[in-house]
Amino acid sequence: MSKLEKLIAELCPDGVEYKTLGEIASISRGGNFQKKDFCDIGVPCIHYGQIYTRYDLFADKTITHITEECARKQKFAKTNDIVMAVTSENIEDVCKCIAWLGNEDVAVSGHSAIISHNQDPK
């Protein structure tokens, strides 16, 4: 019996309903802005490197911004979306995620995935 099967047997004795990721979420890649595009005031953004260096599991405010002009070409996460770093310089940080809980859409950089879903983000 696998570790997952043991946990399910222990915590969910009546079993669990299995769903594919596609049944509860859609996944898209982030945009294409870089650190050089950061500015002091503008559109909130999350750079993939910040996911594992600056953020915890949840965020409702960003650390950085990009200009309106740069933002026009980007992809955005909406409230409750999961933003996942899909690359890193070390294995521990690959696939680290944050749940975006802010009240406005946030631009997401490349090397990130936006997971839009209908689940509780916490």
Question: PLM features: what roles do these ranges have?
Answer:
Residues M1-K3, V106-A107:
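Short acidic (Asp/Glu) and glycine-rich catalytic loops that position anionic groups and cofactors
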